[in-house]
A protein has these predicted regions:
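Thiamine diphosphate
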Residues: 1-58, 64-87
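Active-site-proximal beta-alpha loop/turn segments in soluble metabolic enzymes
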Residues: 63-64, 157
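Conformationally flexible catalytic loops at phosphate/diphosphate-handling active centers
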Residues: 93-184
């Protein structure tokens, strides 16, 4: 991510919990990425691999935006929305679905092809992301310490990015709907 690569990962339950410290950093640095999560229960008094949202809900405070799906077709379509929106919004996404029924369902779906999605990528936002990448040719300092006054001001300035997310997601849902004929 810091090198300007577009990335995503796939995980569930305890694996997602191990990522929480990194999620704060990713969101705080406005690095676009998507975590695809097969939402499952967390181990408590016994081990259980059935679906609930306990793992996903434990990440709400990290700064990631969230999209949820209820069918395998929605997983296909809205994964595209998540990837497109994270680039434009600069906000990372958790894209999640039921970790038992949906993740194990065998169903015919209509695939979105790369050729369908490529024209939807905000090329300017992608170029800006890559221009901020760490590289030996353009060294920068990141992750410095701040006093409370500047830290608070910087955190408040982040709100404009989050306020833009719903409109960006809606825009891409409409564009995906135009391609697929399915309304989101």
């Amino acid at each position: 991510l810091q090198a300007g690569a577009l990335t995503s990962t796939y995980t569930a339950s305890q694996g997602l919990l191990l990522m929480i410290p990194n999620m704060y950093k990713i969101a705080g640095e406005f690095l676009p990425c998507v975590f695809h999560v097969s939402a499952r229960t967390l181990a408590s008094h016994s081990l259980c691999s059935f679906g609930d949202h306990r793992d996903v809900m434990s990440t709400r405070q990290t700064g990631f935006a969230m999209l949820a799906e209820g069918s395998v077709q929605e997983v296909m379509d809205l994964a595209g929305v998540a990837h497109l929106a994270t680039i434009k919004a600069r906000v990372p996404f958790v894209n999640f679905f039921d970790g038992f029924r949906t993740s194990h369902e065998i169903q015919k779906i209509e695939m979105l092809e790369n050729e369908d999605l490529a024209p939807l990528i905000d090329q300017q936002a992608l170029a800006e992301f890559r221009s901020r990448a760490l590289t030996p040719e353009k060294p920068v300092a990141r992750g410095m310490a701040e006093n409370p006054d500047t830290f608070f001001a910087h955190r408040e300035s982040c709100n404009t990015y989050y306020e833009a997310v719903p409109a960006i997601v809606e825009e891409y849902m409409e564009k995906i709907s135009e391609i697929t004929g399915r309304k989101y």
